[in-house]
């Protein structure tokens, strides 16, 4: 699911400019831009691969060691020398990507932004954001009464856990303990007030959008619902897919515009997740078109590498992280195909099925432009149980909710099989699908069986 986000300036400022325009035809409406500036190298970055503790947490370093992964130049921060020279031009650096070796700069002079191409260390520039003529500021619904505690007599999540046989892992004691999960989304509305979400194992939160929100808990509710599918731990009422895991809440999606700048925000969030030692990322965000028609991409670029966000997603497994992402909800519209970064390599792209195991009409389909099977696997996304913005149990549709089911399941499986690498886990999940022998572009490898994976691995290793 793609959600839309808040942006600066708010509408009252635009209204003021519109009045001035009506008074004087000579006044030109101010407009802001963002430019992605790719750099040639990292000379003068001031860091060394021999001292990774200067730019990675100990947990991130240990994750690489455990999976026998080598550090490389993409792990190094950007050149401070280059950053200083860019800032000296009078533009504002609002985001950085060390993996892409690029920065996102903001300014109100397109000519000034374009002049950055003249710098000797700049590889290329790309205009990724043009401010719209007018926008409404996102308004979070006001609450006048306290949120309720969950109520009911049935376990609302029993079906969605059982469909992928995750309930058996939970019963065996594998509930995500010791695993760290990052949720990349557009907002986590009232996750700080809803009782069931206040009790989750949250480590922290960050906002990577420019301009940042005053409070990510007063932004869109989409991320809160996604989080609930994984993290809530209310016995016999609502059990998330990884209720004992620890969670980072990372906002990287604007809520009212769609532009390629959001790829930069996503990359910054993913790199932060890597640096703090996250094991699994859930991204229930996807892009198939942007507000500016010139920024839209054709199907032939759905190859895992043409778009920045997909390139960064394809790198995560090589950093020791499993990325689980939603396939998209375009199955019943003209696009139909998966959305980026679901086209990435070495990730688990998740489509949506009903409780009967039938694909939902909205679930996006594959293949990728280079012929790879997508989606990878399926989970419940038709009437999936979530906690809604009123703090109550509800059933909602979307691959956005199928994805966190699989992300949490991967965290639980990794807890059970700590010696596996990210790439090995991804392949094990695919192989457990009920259509692994005959994959297609609707179901991918089918509905995975996490109990089957664990049983097989224990027997293979001689531990019944």
Residue ranges and their predicted role:
Residues 1-33:
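Bacterial Sec-dependent N-terminal signal peptides
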Residues 31-140:
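Inhibitory N-terminal propeptides of secreted protease zymogens
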Residues 93-97, 112-113, 137-183, 206-220, ...:
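N-terminal domain-start motif of subtilase-like serine proteases
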Residues 168-206, 212-262, 276-279, 292, ...:
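Subtilisin-like serine protease catalytic core
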Residues 227-230, 250-254, 337, 381-443, ...:
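Hydrolase catalytic cores
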Residues 233-236, 249-343, 369-372, 389-403, ...:
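Substrate-binding/access-modulating region of protease and related hydrolase catalytic domains
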């Amino acid at each position: 699911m793609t959600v839309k986000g808040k942006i600066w300036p708010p509408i009252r400022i635009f209204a003021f400019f519109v009045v001035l325009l009506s008074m004087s035809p000579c006044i030109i409406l101010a407009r802001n831009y963002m430019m992605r500036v790719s750099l040639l190298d990292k000379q003068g970055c001031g860091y060394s691969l021999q001292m990774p503790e200067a730019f990675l947490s100990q947990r991130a370093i240990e994750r690489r060691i455990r999976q026998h992964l080598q550090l490389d130049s993409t792990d190094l921060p950007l050149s401070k020398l280059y950053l200083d020279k860019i800032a000296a031009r009078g533009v504002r650096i609002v985001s950085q990507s060390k993996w892409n070796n690029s920065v996102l700069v903001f300014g109100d002079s397109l000519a000034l932004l374009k002049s950055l191409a003249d710098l000797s260390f700049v590889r290329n520039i790309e205009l990724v954001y043009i401010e719209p003529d007018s926008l409404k500021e996102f308004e979070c619904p006001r609450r006048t009464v306290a949120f309720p505690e969950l109520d009911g007599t049935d376990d609302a999540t029993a079906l969605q856990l059982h469909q992928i046989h995750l309930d058996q892992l939970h019963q065996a004691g594998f509930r995500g303990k010791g695993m760290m999960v990052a949720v990349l989304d557009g907002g986590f509305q009232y996750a700080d007030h809803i009782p069931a979400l206040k009790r989750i194992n949250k480590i922290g939160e960050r906002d990577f959008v420019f301009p940042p929100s005053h409070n990510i808990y007063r932004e869109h509710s989409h991320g809160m619902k996604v989080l609930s599918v994984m993290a809530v731990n209310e016995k016999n009422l609502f059990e998330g897919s990884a209720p004992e895991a620890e969670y980072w809440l990372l906002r990287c999606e604007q809520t009212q515009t769609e532009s390629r700048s959001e790829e930069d925000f996503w990359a910054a969030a993913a790199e932060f997740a890597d640096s703090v030692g996250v094991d699994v990322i859930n991204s229930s965000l996807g892009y198939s078109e942007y507000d500016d028609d010139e920024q839209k991409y054709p199907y032939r670029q759905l190859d895992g590498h043409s778009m920045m966000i997909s390139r960064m997603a394809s790198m995560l497994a090589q950093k020791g992280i499993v990325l689980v992402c939603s396939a998209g909800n375009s199955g019943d519209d003209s696009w139909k195909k998966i959305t980026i970064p679901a086209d990435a390599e070495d990730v688990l792209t998740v489509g949506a099925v009903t409780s009967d195991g039938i694909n939902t009409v909205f679930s996006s389909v594959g293949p990728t432009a280079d012929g790879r099977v997508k989606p990878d696997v399926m989970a419940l996304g038709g009437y999936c149980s979530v906690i809604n913005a009123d703090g109550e149990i509800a059933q909602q549709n979307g691959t956005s909710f199928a994805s966190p089911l699989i992300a949490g399941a991967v965290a639980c499986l990794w807890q059970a099989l700590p010696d596996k690498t990210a790439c090995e886990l991804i392949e094990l999940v695919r192989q457990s699908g009920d259509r692994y022998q005959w994959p297609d572009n609707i179901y991918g490898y089918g509905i995975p069986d996490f109990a089957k994976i664990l049983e097989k691995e224990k027997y293979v290793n001689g531990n019944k």
